[in-house]
Amino acid sequence: MGKRRAKRLLESYEANGKRLEPGVCVMLRPPSPKTPSYIARIERIESDAAGRVKMWCRWYYRPEESIGGRRCFHGVKELFLSDHYDGCYPEAVEGVCSVHNLKDYAYLDVVEEEDFFCRFEYNASTGMFAPDTVAVYCKCEMPYNPDSLMVQCEDCKDWFHPECVNLPSRGVESMKDFICPDCS
């Protein structure tokens, strides 16, 4: 039996003009042009004896790819970090992206096409999430969605969707003080 040649770990690799290294999030070309890019985090990059390079990636899932599907509180740019790993080739990289935590994403002045956020880890085989509970807001008791406008009560400091407290959406951002129905 022949000796198996060792693979060599690479600190970084350049593909399509992009510097790739462990920890970097990438957008990967899907099989169909109608499908959005796949998003993954590079865990390691290795080269075999013939010089072929392969990245080991941890996948992010979109809500609609999970067992529970997309819910109304999921943001448009929301992803779940999964326990699903695969080998990928650098040639499939379309670009580099940023996957922020929810708090950092909410404070972005401008959300670019390459910006995403993640607040859950997802076990692809069981369909379970971590954390399995999340804070809820408003009278509707829904988790925070950065795509939905909310207003804070000056007294109790709770957050509300304008439509849930009978406020017109227009002009809410310029309101000086808001007092919720429970505090007024």
Regions found by a protein language model. Give the residues of each.
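Cys/His-enriched microdomains
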Residues: A135-C138, V151, F178
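Short Cys/His-rich metal-coordination motifs, predominantly Zn2+-binding knuckles/fingers
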Residues: C140-N145, D155-C156, C164, C183
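Cys/His-coordinated zinc-finger cores
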Residues: C156-E173
